[in-house]
């Protein structure tokens, strides 16, 4: 029963998020913020597919232990696409609040993203192993958590400063996103 429920949920989620993202990109009519959100949705769905499709196959067949390498590879790809997702979210912030300059801040965002991706690429992660080291999971998540904290603070401060009713809870959605992602 678990296999059917999880697989069904994952399929609906992947189809929905990728299609919504594609529709947003196609219908953005020059609105760069809208295009960025659409791109984020496609990247999120595509990245998650690398983890969720092997997960669903494993659940519906011989079990997770027989798909260790595929699941590890999916987790690796998802780690990188989530990093790109948050870099794009930074650009949503820049567009929404018409931020110009701030090259130091942009350098920090790209530096944290590069550090995260570099750490994800290290063989010590043992992505394809049945028992990857917890320490490397922590190391690679440090720059990611800092990137997330930075984006959270930017949205919180800007929404408050601009009295942006539509985005007043954006910071909280990012916190929840991290809360759901980090255990994975």
Positions of PLM-derived features:
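Hydrophobic transmembrane alpha-helical segments in integral membrane proteins
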Residues: 1-19, 137-143
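Hydrophobic alpha-helical transmembrane segments of multi-pass membrane proteins
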Residues: 8, 76-80, 142, 146
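Anionic, Ser/Thr-rich low-complexity intrinsically disordered regions
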Residues: 12, 24-28, 34, 96, ...
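Internal transmembrane alpha-helix with an interfacial aromatic "cap," most often the third helix
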Residues: 19-27, 50-107, 118-125, 153-158
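Loop-to-helix transition at the N-terminal end of transmembrane alpha-helices
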Residues: 32-45
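Hydrophobic alpha-helical membrane segments
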Residues: 44-47, 115, 144-153, 167-184
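Membrane-helix boundary/juxtamembrane motif in polytopic membrane proteins
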Residues: 102-108, 133-139, 155-176
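Extracellular-loop-to-transmembrane junctions of the mid-late helices
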Residues: 127-153
């Amino acid at each position: 029963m678990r296999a059917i429920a999880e697989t069904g949920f994952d399929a609906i989620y992947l189809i929905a998020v990728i299609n919504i993202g594609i529709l947003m990109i196609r219908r953005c009519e020059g609105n760069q913020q809208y295009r960025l959100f659409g791109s984020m949705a496609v990247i999120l769905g595509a990245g998650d597919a690398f983890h969720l499709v092997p997960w669903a196959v494993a659940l519906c067949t011989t079990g997770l232990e027989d798909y260790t390498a595929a699941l590890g590879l999916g987790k690796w790809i998802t780690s990188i696409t989530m990093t790109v997702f948050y870099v794009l979210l930074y650009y949503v912030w820049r567009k929404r609040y018409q931020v110009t300059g701030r090259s130091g801040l942009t350098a920090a965002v790209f530096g944290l993203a590069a550090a995260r991706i570099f750490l994800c690429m290290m063989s010590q992660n043992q992505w394809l192993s049945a028992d990857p080291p917890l320490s490397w999971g922590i190391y690679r998540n440090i720059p990611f958590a800092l990137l997330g904290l930075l984006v959270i603070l930017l949205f919180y401060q800007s929404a408050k400063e601009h009295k942006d009713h539509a985005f007043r809870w954006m910071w909280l959605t990012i916190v929840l996103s991290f809360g759901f992602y980090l255990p994975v």
